[in-house]
From Swiss-Prot:
Keywords: Behavior, Cell membrane, Cell projection, Glycoprotein, Ion channel, Ion transport, Ligand-gated ion channel, Membrane, Receptor, Signal, Transmembrane, Transmembrane helix, Transport. The chain crosses the membrane at residues 433-453, 505-525, 708-728. The lineage of its organism: Eukaryota, Metazoa, Ecdysozoa, Arthropoda, Hexapoda. It is found in: Cell projection, Cilium membrane. Residues 760-777, 788-800 have a biased composition (Polar residues). It comes from Anopheles gambiae (African malaria mosquito). Glycans are attached at residues 67, 177, 355, 464, 561, 586, 611, 763, 797. Integral part of a neural sensory system in the antenna that provides the neural basis for the response to environmental changes in temperature (thermosensation). Specifically, required for thermosensing by the cooling cell. Plays a role in heat seeking and heat-stimulated blood feeding behavior. One of its GO terms (cellular component) is ciliary membrane. This is Ionotropic receptor 21a. Residues 757-839, 911-938 are annotated as: Disordered. The gene is Ir21a. Belongs to the glutamate-gated ion channel (TC 1.A.10.1) family. In both female and male antenna, expressed specifically in 3 sensory neurons of flagellomere 13 segment (at protein level). SUPFAM superfamilies: Periplasmic binding protein-like II.
Length: 975
């Protein structure tokens, strides 16, 4: 019994001693330090650091330890140097196994459990990122960004990520101020897209680093708490990062040493209410290299339910037909603004589709033009959307965001045109001018082959224009059957086969041409023909136009850098106006030089059809907008830069274009806003009214056939012009002959005056004419310049009666006339003249006729003829000669010549007072008075001897002189 007690005590003591020794052996203090030194570290990593409101395990920095050692005090350093060095105890080798000894690897695992745990978390995150990259980021080059904190504390994770990165990538380092060391990597070159993988300590600085991202995928791995992540996802800073995925580590309280912590994947929902708030959304979690929820889209589509009634601010300006502003007043005088137009209807449809509301506000700076004013305020962020029929240009795309083009518009020319060609031009309508030229040439050139085939020569045509004219009428009459030629030289009577073949060919050609013309003339007469319109810049440059456009809205600068030569030539003198109404007024009121206005084609057509169509009703001229586009533009909506609602609205516009809704809305606007020609709105028609009625038959009116009458009138006018030219040419030739004859007569008169003056100075008496039996002893009285009737005595032998007619100059009342015969010197005549002398004929003429003769042929005739003892006009003389053909077998000229020769014939064969023998044959004796005196005027006396014998009983030796007697008033009495 005692032995058992002693044995039990011994065992108990041994057990206590062995347990204490084993415990001291199993957990030695120096052993842990040796293991740490084995990894190259001097102390245990047992401290924690606070970073971005998250606790995490820190690392030991040898540089900081060295710095602390270098800056220690001398006393401390002396104490550290005096301290005893660490003594390494060798492992005790005991071949006896006590309990359950562990291997070295198990001991290392127990001592370095936190390192192994961090390694597992790192590998799990790297695996998750590789999976996301291969599934979502493979189409775009990813940009990996990390800040300084991650680079210093998690270099093992970055090394593992970059070593197994599946695709090409770009890396960037974020500086201490959350700015990139190389900002150029955020600006992609070319069409390649970008995606981002960001390692960041503070999640709230994400937008500052990368800015707004509308289309790029962003994967964010922050080192912040879950509460900070949710705050970021609900804040305004994450609203303009649409495709956002946040990976956050889940921190649990009961952390087991070998357990892996899961990663939670977050995103956000945009515009969950009318205020535009965001809400964080948990997608799934990642643990054990797999997702907790399979088949989850990590980048879901945002704004699928619209904007939840969010109210947008819309900037709008009047720009028809896209935005039309209408003012109306209510019963109390308040002004109400109502907006219409294509873009307004489009906005209403999109508001219902995307579930949002809007407020329309007009821009402030209207002097910039509707488009530029709206763009300026949207660029400054004063509105969420801009509507004003804004053209898509490079400068506007750089300053703002523009939607896809919902419509197209272009710059067009507005000109004044004729509504229809005049009906009188319808006779020329069936053929164009080249056809008319060809037909005329064919008929003209037909003369030569026909003439050559008939005569076998062309000599009879060369230089003979009258023959060529006759040939033309032969051709025209033969082919048109309007004239018939049966002469000896007519081609219709030819017997040559070649000529007949040519005539037949031309005849068939004429039949075909005539059939073509008559078949088309009815259509051109009954239906109006539209004239040529200005539809292109080539036509505009060929005409004389002044070109103008607006001085605002971009029109003043859009065409300055054109590379088109015709455009630069046309717009080098571009005029500017302040409004479209002023430009239209310049077009309609242009004088001498036409005016063309460049503007929006949609706006010009809208203004013409809605406001100006009734003004040009039943008028020959109207406004015309060119069909060709001078410059094509797309019409879009304007958004501020990096707008979240841009893509949903773009998708809605594309859906509406595919469905044809935009075309329907455009037709509705045209139907409800544009007016008809009578100024009323367009009205809908149903049933039978929509069917087009056939045109009713009608007879041709005078307006339809006025071209034919005008053609006939044109022929008469041309013929009258030719007749006048022939008459003028004949008168011109006659005047030339008269002037030539007058010059010769004056020359002869001057010679006779000189001879008469010489004879008068020698003899001092008048030349005496030969006597006749008719006027012998027959005195004739004549009133002298003093009013006394003087009888002209007979000659020395009493055979002739001398009369003097003063034709030029005027004698003074008191001047004696040496040629006047005293009254008692006259002798009585036994018989009277058979024909009246010229003086008697003149005395029988009325005073009115004498006044006409003196004043000249202003109202009556240019030629006075003395015929059968009477003064008459040339036309009366021609009629008298025509009536008395039995008596006068000769022409009027021969009759006049005979009458004048009988009237102006000297009776004397040879005068004794003549200076020369041939002076007796002259028509009259011309004597100059006062050879010794200075003469101021020249007076010519003509002695007329009226012969009493019968006509035709003249002596063979009688000299017949023919002269034209001209008075001082310059009238030609006889010729």
């Amino acid at each position: 019994m005692f032995k058992r007690i002693v044995l039990a005590v011994i065992n108990l003591v041994f057990l206590i001693v062995s347990t204490t020794a084993f415990a001291s052996l199993h957990y030695p203090e120096s052993f842990n330090q040796q293991l740490i030194r084995y990894k190259g570290r001097d102390s245990s990593n047992g401290y924690f650091e606070l970073a971005s409101e998250a606790y995490y395990t820190g690392t030991y920095d040898l540089v900081e330890e060295l710095n602390e050692t270098a800056t220690c005090l001398r006393a401390d350093c002396r104490e550290q140097s005096n301290s005893s060095p660490v003594v390494r105890d060798r492992r005790r080798v005991d071949p006896t196994f006590y309990g359950h000894p562990k291997t070295r690897e198990q001991i290392w695992e127990r001592n370095f459990a936190h390192v192994i745990e961090d390694n597992r978390q790192t590998l799990s995150l790297v695996t998750l990122l590789n999976k996301i990259i291969l599934k979502y980021l493979h189409s775009c080059i990813p940009i990996v960004l990390f800040d300084t904190y991650v680079a210093t504390t998690e270099n093992y994770m970055l090394e593992a990520l970059f070593s197994d990165f599946p695709i090409t990538y770009i890396t960037g380092r974020i500086g201490p101020n959350y700015t990139l060391d190389n900002p150029g990597i955020l600006e992609p070159t070319g069409p390649q897209c970008r995606s981002y993988i960001i390692f960041l300590a503070d999640v709230m600085m994400t937008r500052k680093v990368i800015g707004p991202q509308m289309n790029s995928y962003v994967v964010l791995i922050p080192r912040s708490s879950q509460w900070k992540l949710q705050e970021f996802l609900a804040a305004k800073q994450s609203r303009d990062i649409i495709n956002l995925l946040v990976i956050g580590e889940s921190y649990s309280v009961d952390k087991r040493i070998n357990n892996e912590q899961p990663y939670v994947l977050y995103t956000h929902e945009l515009y969950i209410d009318g205020l535009g708030a965001n809400r964080p959304q948990v997608l799934t979690s990642w643990i054990g290299n797999k997702f907790s929820r399979n088949n989850v889209n990590l980048f879901p589509r945002k704004l699928r339910k619209g904007f939840s009634g969010h109210r947008f601010t819309v900037k709008a300006a009047h720009q028809p037909p896209f935005m039309i502003k209408r003012l109306s007043t209510d019963g109390v005088g308040n002004v109400n603004i109502r907006w219409e137009g294509l873009e307004m209807r489009l906005l209403r449809v999109m508001a219902q589709y995307l579930n949002f509301t809007y407020d329309i506000i007009e821009p402030g700076r209207t002097e910039l033009g509707p488009g530029d004013a709206v763009v300026e305020e949207i660029k400054r962020g004063q509105g969420d959307m801009g509507l004003a029929g804004i053209y898509v240009t490079i400068e506007r795309n750089l300053a703002t965001e523009m939607s896809v083009s919902h419509s197209t518009d272009c710059a067009a020319f507005l000109t004044l045109m004729s509504s229809a060609l005049p009906r009188y031009r319808a006779i020329l309508g069936p053929f164009q001018w080249p056809v008319w030229v060809a037909v005329i040439l064919i008929y003209l050139l037909a003369i030569f082959p026909l003439a050559f085939s008939d005569k076998m020569t062309l000599r009879h045509l060369l230089g003979n224009w009258s023959e060529i004219e006759n040939m033309f009428w032969y051709v025209f009459g033969t082919f048109t059957n309007s004239l018939t030629f049966q002469g000896e030289n007519s081609w219709s009577n030819t017997r040559k086969t070649s000529t007949r073949m040519l005539i037949g060919i031309y005849w068939v050609f004429t039949i075909i041409i005539t059939a073509c013309y008559t078949g088309s003339i009815i259509a051109f007469i009954t239906l109006p023909v539209e004239p040529e319109r200005i539809d292109g810049i080539e036509q505009l440059s060929r005409g004389f136009f002044r070109v103008g456009t607006l001085d605002r809205g971009g029109w003043e600068r859009w065409f300055l850098n054109s590379s088109h030569k015709q455009t630069n030539k046309l717009l080098k003198d571009l005029r500017f106006v302040s409004s479209v109404d002023e430009g239209i007024r310049n077009v309609t009121e242009a004088f001498l030089i036409s005016y063309a206005f460049i503007g929006s084609k949609g706006e010009l057509e809208f203004l013409i059809k809605s406001n100006l169509s009734h003004q040009f009703e039943n008028k020959r001229y109207g406004l015309h907008v060119s069909r060709e586009c001078f410059a094509l533009y797309g019409v879009s909506m304007v958004f501020p830069p990096n707008s979240v609602h841009r893509d949903p609205i773009n998708n809605a516009i594309l859906y509406m274009q595919e469905a044809g809704l935009i075309g329907k809305l455009n037709r509705d606007v045209t139907w409800e806003t544009m007016k008809t020609k009578d100024g009323r709105r367009k009205e809908a028609s149903v049933g039978e009214v929509l069917r087009s009625t056939a045109p009713s038959e009608r007879g041709l009116t005078l307006a339809d056939t006025e071209g034919m009458f005008l053609l006939m009138l044109f022929g008469y006018v041309v013929a009258l012009g030719v007749l006048i030219s022939e008459w003028v040419g004949g008168c011109t030739n006659k005047c030339r002959e008269v002037l030539k004859e007058r010059a010769e007569r004056l020359k002869a008169a001057a010679a006779e005056i000189a001879a008469a003056a010489t004879a008068g100075s020698d003899n001092g008496s008048l030349p005496v004419s030969s006597p006749t039996s008719t006027n012998r002893n027959s005195p004739h009285k004549r009133t002298g310049p003093n009013g006394v009737e003087n009888s002209l005595p007979a000659s020395g032998n009493g055979s002739a009666t001398v009369r003097r007619i003063r034709l030029t100059g005027e004698d003074s009342e008191n001047e004696p006339n040496e040629y006047d015969v005293p009254p008692d010197a006259a002798s009585d005549g036994g018989s009277s003249l058979q024909r009246h002398s010229l003086s008697e004929c003149l005395s029988e003429v009325s005073a009115h006729t004498m006044q006409d003769l003196y004043n000249g042929p202003d109202r009556r005739h240019s030629t006075i003829v003395f015929l059968d003892g009477q003064l008459m006009s040339e036309e009366e003389a021609q009629r008298k000669v025509a009536r008395s053909k039995s008596r006068h077998r000769h022409s009027l000229s021969s009759v006049l010549e005979r009458e004048v020769s009988q009237l102006f014939r000297f009776l004397g064969k040879e005068s004794p007072h003549s200076a020369r023998a041939d002076e007796s044959s002259d028509a009259g004796g011309l004597v100059r008075r006062g050879a010794g005196r200075e003469r101021k005027e020249m007076k010519v006396a003509v002695e007329i001897n009226a012969r009493a014998t019968e006509e035709g009983q003249q002596g063979p030796g009688a000299a017949v002189g023919r002269r034209s007697i001209e008075a001082t008033f310059g009238e030609k009495l006889l010729h």
